[in-house]
Swiss-Prot record:
Protein source organism: Streptococcus salivarius
UniProt cofactor(s): Mn(2+); Fe(3+)
Gene3D superfamilies the record matches: Fe,Mn superoxide dismutase (SOD) domain (1.10.287.990), Iron/manganese superoxide dismutase, C-terminal domain (3.55.40.20)
Alphabetized InterPro entries for the sequence: Mn/Fe_SOD, Mn/Fe_SOD_C, Mn/Fe_SOD_N, Mn/Fe_SOD_N_sf, SOD_C_sf
Entry binding sites for Fe(3+): H10, H64
Pfam families cross-referenced by the UniProt entry: Sod_Fe_C, Sod_Fe_N
Name of the protein this chain belongs to: Superoxide dismutase [Mn/Fe]
EC top class, as a word: oxidoreductase
The keyword Oxidoreductase is assigned to this record: yes
Lineage, broadest ranks: Bacteria, Bacillati, Bacillota, Bacilli, Lactobacillales
UniProt GO molecular function: metal ion binding; superoxide dismutase activity
Annotated Mn(2+) binding sites: H10, H64
Length: 145
């Protein structure tokens, strides 16, 4: 359970600020386009004067956007395909839950726990600090907390 006050703060303040700051950085270099996922997949292509701003704020936007997309008022079970991939990667859904919980609860300071598809097409649990996104490490996030 996450209370309404926390969700409002994250949506109306944090996420809105990440969007505004990412847009301000992108305005300085319109030639690079606005595809944050592509830019953050190869951060070296981002001009040095806005690189950290896009890593922080673009990452914050992408992370929160996925988080909002995944929220549901009702408990949802994974699809059969995802459940099979979880069982293959972790041995059981319970083992996945333990790994995901550990990633979320052992992160010092702010950050995220992720279920990602790695470059080998396999599921893994990772944690990132602050607003870093696993996209920058070549991973595709499918669950975020």
């Amino acid at each position: 359970y996450i209370d309404a006050e926390t969700m409002t703060l994250h949506h109306d303040k944090h996420h809105a600020t990440y969007v505004a700051n990412a847009n301000a950085a992108l305005e300085k270099h319109p030639e690079i386009g606005e595809d944050l996922e592509a830019l953050l997949a190869d951060v070296e292509q981002i001009p040095a004067d806005i690189r950290q701003a896009l890593i922080n704020n673009g990452g914050g936007h992408l992370n929160h956007a996925l988080f909002w997309e995944l929220l549901s008022p009702e408990k949802q079970e994974p699809t059969a395909e995802v459940a099979a991939a979880i069982n293959e990667a972790f041995g059981s859904f319970e083992a996945f839950q333990e790994a995901f919980t550990a990633a979320a609860t052992t992160r010092f300071g702010s950050g995220w726990a992720w279920l990602v598809v790695n470059d080998e097409g396999k599921l893994e649990v990772v944690s990132t600090a602050n607003q870093d996104t696993p996209i920058s490490d070549g991973k595709k996030p499918i669950l975020a907390l």
